[in-house]
From Swiss-Prot:
InterPro entries, sorted: Aldolase_TIM, DHquinase_I, Type-I_3-dehydroquinase
GO molecular function, one term: 3-dehydroquinate dehydratase activity
Originating gene: aroD
Protein name as annotated: 3-dehydroquinate dehydratase
Purpose of the protein: Involved in the third step of the chorismate pathway, which leads to the biosynthesis of aromatic amino acids. Catalyzes the cis-dehydration of 3-dehydroquinate (DHQ) and introduces the first double bond of the aromatic ring to yield 3-dehydroshikimate.
EC annotation from Swiss-Prot or TrEMBL: 4.2.1.10
Length: 228
């Protein structure tokens, strides 16, 4: 699994003050730009992209509809994405597919999309349909994060991931069953076919996230050779 860690500055000075040494063991940086006022995102961008030069960066605008901190119309949402992409060409762009489906046609030329779906209330009954619809579009990554209400919800998310990965071996998935109940899914990526796991450093960006240090210890244990 590749490890993703968020940076969530609320203003330019916070972006400038980020200690990049904390991110040495992280594979990808997710810039959660939704913690900024919409008019400040482009102004803060140089601090992020210059500070993390050499690291792969995910540009994410997580809107309130999917558990984020910014309210945007779909057109505002896609316009900010386009502006950031035109200037900085981030390695990945997170696109909230079902929330902003009306402007998805404007994203068809983007080769680096993470099509994402977040549900902080439940694991919906139509989860398999969500997997299917996004997988058919063949983005760089299909990301699904849902909240379990039962152990079966956790198993369903993991089983769907394994099934879709088996049928679509070239497609990358990043799937999460959130909260304490779903934490197992964050550690099982290599088994179920989820390529990325999201961790926290200074601040948690999703329910059930573990710290980078804890994740490193867990991965070390999972990879131990225990043969006699």
């Amino acid at each position: 699994m590749r490890i993703v860690a968020p940076v969530m500055p609320r203003h330019f000075d916070e972006a400038q003050a980020i200690d990049i040494s904390k991110y040495e063991d992280v594979n990808l940086i997710e810039w959660r730009a939704d913690f900024l006022p919409k008019d400040e995102i482009v102004a803060v961008a140089p601090a992020i992209f210059e500070k993390f030069a050499g690291k792969e960066i995910i540009f994410t605008l997580r809107t309130v509809q999917e558990g984020g901190n910014i309210t945007l119309s779909s057109q505002e949402y896609v316009d900010i994405i386009k502006e950031i992409n035109a200037i900085y060409n981030p390695d990945y762009i997170d696109f909230e597919y079902f929330t902003h489906k009306s402007v998805f046609q404007e994203m068809l030329d983007f080769p680096n999309l993470i099509l994402s779906y977040h549900n902080f209330e439940e694991t919906p009954e139509n989860l398999m349909e969500a997997f299917s619809e996004m997988t058919k579009l063949a983005p760089r990554v299909v990301k699904i994060a849902v909240m379990p209400q039962s152990e079966q919800d956790v198993l369903d998310l993991m089983n769907y991931t394994r099934g879709f990965k088996t049928l679509n071996p070239e497609q990358e998935f990043a799937t999460i069953s959130m909260g304490k109940l779903g934490r197992l899914s964050r550690f099982a990526g290599d088994v179920i076919g989820s390529s990325w796991t999201y961790v926290s450093l200074d601040h948690v960006s999703g329910p059930g996230q573990v710290t980078l240090n804890d994740m490193k210890r867990i991965i070390e244990v999972l990879e131990m050779d225990i043969s006699n």
